[in-house]
Regions:
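Active-site mouth loops of central-metabolism enzymes
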Residues: 38-41, 73-87, 146-153, 220-222
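Conserved alpha-helical substructure of the radical SAM core
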Residues: 56-109
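Conserved, mostly hydrophobic/aromatic
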Residues: 49, 110, 172, 215, ...
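Conserved AdoMet/S-adenosylmethionine-binding subsite of the radical SAM
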Residues: 98-101, 113-257
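Auxiliary Fe-S-binding modules of radical SAM enzymes
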Residues: 1, 228-303
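Residue-level preference for long, well-ordered alpha-helices that form the structural scaffold
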Residues: 78-85, 89, 123, 189-193, ...
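N-terminal [4Fe-4S]-dependent radical SAM core
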Residues: 1-48, 55-79, 303
Length: 303
């Protein structure tokens, strides 16, 4: 018999700010110790990844939530929203810092859907504003510094700007490593180009440091051995890889099923060996990501 328990909802989810907003409008928890900052809802990439349901979820959010569409060129934009957003974000983080789930530490993750392809530099600028505003506030509890999960900017100088703003690690998620599967399952990312991501991952490793340029994959969308070969190649450039096991979200457009237990074991065992050879650690800690087994395999808790 297996006992199943669920992560307790943090106290701050029910707390209101001076503005009347709920704190969970600005921050959210994942696993036991992640603090996720999702500045806007929705994704305006040219063509959505087929496994992703982010735009299905976005329509269920409060009508006054900031949406990627509000940040389109010519819209009211970030300049109009910035001051109130940053103030409410700081107040929300103050509430979160008082809760039990972050008593030991927290993994601060800045993450969102894409702005349109021609606004990726602006997206990086918005992340800079947020990171610069909160870096001192989260520093005492923030294990690895602020982690920015973002589609890479066109302008490589934005990587230096992100670092100066307080971002410690950048995550440019390929999601699928190799063609033809990359083009099939991530048509919008494919339009930007696989090399667009890989070259910026490599450059980020020189800007932020070896082991501080990350990419994630969806395990189950391509042959495992080809994916592991790419993870090994990326590790040689100082890039750390991981994966979430495929799960079918509401709104996904998939023609495949999640991988078998044997496939999951084969991949994460292989990835743990790569990380060991290159001196890398798995992302975050075992309390955080619950759709990945990187930490369990690193700690030898899989057998």
């Amino acid at each position: 018999r297996v006992k199943v328990s669920f992560v307790k909802q943090p106290e701050y989810y029910a707390q209101r700010l001076a503005s009347g907003d709920l704190a969970q409008k600005y921050i959210s928890a994942c696993g036991y110790d992640e603090l996720n900052i999702i500045p806007w809802k929705g994704c305006l990439i040219s063509s959505v990844c087929r496994f992703c349901g982010v735009n299905s979820v976005a329509v269920k959010n409060p009508n006054d939530a900031l949406h990627a569409a509000h940040l389109r060129t010519g819209a009211l934009g970030w300049e109009a929203a910035r001051a109130s957003y940053l103030g409410n974000l700081s107040e929300s983080i103050n509430l979160a810092l008082q809760t039990e789930c972050y008593s030991e530490h927290m993994h601060v993750i800045l993450i969102s859907g894409n702005l349109p392809d021609d606004q990726l530099d602006q997206q990086a600028d918005i992340y800079c504003d947020i990171a610069a505003h909160i870096k001192g506030q989260v520093a005492p509890k923030c294990t690895e510094g602020i982690v920015a999960v973002i589609t890479p900017p066109h302008d490589l100088a934005r990587l230096y700007k992100l670092k100066q703003a307080g971002v410690a690690i950048v995550v440019f998620n390929l999601e699928v490593g190799n063609d033809p599967w990359f083009s099939k399952y991530c048509p919008g990312k494919s339009a930007l180009g696989r090399d667009f991501f890989i070259e910026r991952l490599k450059h980020a490793a020189t800007v932020f440091g070896r082991g501080k340029s990350w990419t994630n994959f969806v395990l189950g969308l391509e042959p495992v051995d080809e994916l592991l070969a790419l993870c090994e190649k990326l590790a040689g450039y100082g890039i750390v890889s991981s994966a979430n096991v495929l799960h079918v979200d509401e709104g996904s457009q998939l023609d495949c099923v999640p991988p078998t237990k044997e496939t999951v074991i084969h991949f994460f065992h292989g990835l743990a060996q790569i990380n060991l050879r290159y001196g890398f650690d798995a992302f975050y800690c075992a309390k955080a990501l619950r759709t990945s087994l990187s930490n369990e395999f690193q700690d030898g808790r899989w057998a």
